[in-house]
């Protein structure tokens, strides 16, 4: 909150998570006048922004560039693949344990296969709720859907990430 993207002679400077500048973040949200503004763009405008984020942001020397996309196989995904294909990208699929999310991930996996995007593996996010008082993990939305999907599809299962209120609070305060 309160972070802004700055323009330099080399391009946009991403927002950094701390003074070490080890983790730079870029979001359309940083470019809006108000955090309550909506983004109502059609394909060409979205495609242009994707290209701008990849070419006009001063990323510096990167070990990794993590691109978080919504589930699905929209124009944005196709545009993104066209733009990053020369860099030999790889994907990590992220799901939640519910059946509807697993179904979305099957479509995403089908997309990666059709466009030749190698998948490193799958992560199950929101895999249980960690009680802030006793640290017990309750599986609110079930458990094991991600591991099961990974096994069925021949993917590496990279692990589970529970909902942790302490982490949520820390991120909100950052």
Task: Give the role of each language-model region.
Residues 1-32, 47:
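Phosphate-binding loop that captures ATP/GTP phosphates
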Residues 5-6, 14-20, 57-60, 84-86, ...:
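Solvent-exposed alpha-helices and their adjacent loops that cap or buttress functional pockets
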Residues 5-8, 47-50, 74, 139-140:
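Short gly/ser/thr-rich secondary-structure transition/capping motifs
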Residues 17, 51, 55-59, 114-117, ...:
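Generic secondary-structure signature for well-ordered alpha-helical cores
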Residues 27-34, 86-90:
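A short small-residue
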Residues 30-80, 102:
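Phosphate-binding/switch loop-helix module in NTP-utilizing enzymes
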Residues 64-169:
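Conserved catalytic-core segment of NTP-binding enzymes
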Residues 171-174:
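C-terminal boundary of histidine-terminating zinc-finger modules
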């Amino acid at each position: 909150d309160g972070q802004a993207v700055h323009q330099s002679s080399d391009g946009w400077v991403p927002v950094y998570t701390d003074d070490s500048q080890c983790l730079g973040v870029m979001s359309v949200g940083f470019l809006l006048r108000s955090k309550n503004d909506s983004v109502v763009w059609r394909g060409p405008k979205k495609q242009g922004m994707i290209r701008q984020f990849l070419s006009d942001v001063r990323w510096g020397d990167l070990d990794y560039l993590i691109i978080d996309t919504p589930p699905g196989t929209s124009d944005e995904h196709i545009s993104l693949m066209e733009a990053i294909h020369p860099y030999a990208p790889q994907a990590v699929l992220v799901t939640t344990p519910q059946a509807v999310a697993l179904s979305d991930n099957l479509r995403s996996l089908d997309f990666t296969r059709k466009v030749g995007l190698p998948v490193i593996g799958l992560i199950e996010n929101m895999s249980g709720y960690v009680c802030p008082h006793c640290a017990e993990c309750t599986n609110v939305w079930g458990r094991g859907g991600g591991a099961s999907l990974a096994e069925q599809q021949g993917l590496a299962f990279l692990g589970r990430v529970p909902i942790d209120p302490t982490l949520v609070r820390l991120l909100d305060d950052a």
